[in-house]
Amino acid sequence: MGCAYGRAVPYEGEVSPQGRPGVPGTRLLAESAALKQFSRRGFLAGTGAAGLLAADMLLTRQVQAQRRTDRILPVADDFADAYYPDASWFLFPGYKTSWEEAQWILNSLRGALNKRARLAAVGYSNQGLDIDSIVIAVIEYVRAQKLTKLFFYGHSFGGMVATQVAARLLEIHGVEVQFIVLDSSPYSKHDVLDQSWFDGVVFLYERGFRFPSTLRGGYELGERVIHKDERSWRQILDQTLEQLSPIAPSSLLIQSESAYIYYFDGSRFAGKLGGAKMAYIGNPRDRTVRYQTAVEAWAVAFKANMVSSSLHTEGARPAHASPGWNPNVYRPVLDQLLDEHFPLPRGGSRVTVF
């Protein structure tokens, strides 16, 4: 039924609580108190979440800013720091290997490496791979730490970088590297088994194209699925997400690494390493680098420096350059190499630090 002035009678649900007959005052007070409590709780939760997000964004920005330049990343080791203050390992990370993963690899291998020297990793700049800049970072660290003995570990393509840096250090600064370990390192682009994507990355990089995260994410997932027999599905997902993290190697760095591999010519550095010793370790089951051609090429080109090229990382999974995942496979191999070519002083079980 209508009412005066053309207004319809409101439904019960449209009447405010204050206008409802029979609503006790205690109920109104309870509803008000509940609303007040909810608002305070929601406000505090929202403020806390916003604070955490802001802190995370600030930390991420700081980390990204730090990675605009090449840096040497020391890994603390009480034993090595005390007994070998003048010697250091430098780990040159492989393709798409982050700063965190490089340090993780050193931590995995510390039981073998810390018997000869301290530990440090080379963090590549997210602005792109620049050998001159890496050489500067290394020599500045050498001088600051007063190092006289340098040991290089080339992880996958990092073996190429380690070799060139060693040659440049001797040529420009007169600093000779003691030992270079090549872990599953390709000698040239021809040793890389998957040429299709490799060529495309270099082609686009040289024309100034930079991969967006969405395209890169699809590739990262696809690449690992292809080699799913070497990883669990959990590892596939974790490694793909790591590559899409804000602190992962940038697309620019990855593309420049691809171009470096594509044009690398190891013969340019043969005969330019002085008395440095070299050793190649790898796995015949490697499905990323063609092991047989790579090890033979390195052994021939650096015949004067190569002291070992027959030790295998049998049982490692993935088979290609995986010391972080397989320290129990890698440490005995490194122990054998170092004991043979850099034997520790024999003088009993106690060593005195002077």
List the predicted regions and their residue ranges.
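N-terminal secretory signal peptides
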Residues: 1-38
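N-terminal export leaders
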Residues: 38-52
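Short, surface-exposed "cap/lid" segments of acyl-processing enzymes
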Residues: 65-113
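Conserved alpha/beta-hydrolase
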Residues: 110-127
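Gly/Ala-rich beta-loop-alpha elbow adjacent to hydrolase catalytic centers
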Residues: 154-162
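Active-site nucleophile loop of the alpha/beta-hydrolase fold
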Residues: 181-191
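Serine-hydrolase catalytic core
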Residues: 227-307
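Catalytic active-site module of serine/aspartate enzymes centered on a nucleophile-bearing elbow/loop
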Residues: 310-354
